[in-house]
Amino acid sequence: MDNNKVLEMRNIHKSFPGVRALKGVDFHLNKGEIHALMGENGAGKSTLIKVLTGVYSKDEGQIFIDGKDKAVSIHSPQEAQKLGISTVYQEITLCPNLSVAENMYIGRSNKIYQNWKKMNEDADKILQNLDIPAKASQQLASCSIAVQQMVAIARAVDMDCKVL
């Protein structure tokens, strides 16, 4: 596999009762590239993303992350995250009653904070680097929908992901 390829999917198949959603899909993503999946309703865009992120298991095919065959390992979104695959959902999946920083770090094994001040400082740095107009200590519910989505992106970016 090419050293620039951060993601490669080969011959991916996925079927549901009475429907073949994916038939032999091949796809690769080089480091630094941005791609968009486009197609008609029912074309398999969401299914492909859900196979990649471990929401659905694939019927056939291989998935490589940084040249390593990870197809056997991706059986849940948590396993996908450990492999460096992070997801920002179209629907906001954050907790409005928590602060921005709490939303960025909740449920994360790679960043555990005992010190709230340090957590807020780290979150503020990330927000500032990404030009997100929010403060770490701010309640998420007080942010606009657009800023809430930016916080979700900041959370994903800060996970040191290879594929977002």
What are these regions (language model features)?
Residues 1-164:
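Glycine-rich phosphate-binding loops of nucleotide-dependent enzymes
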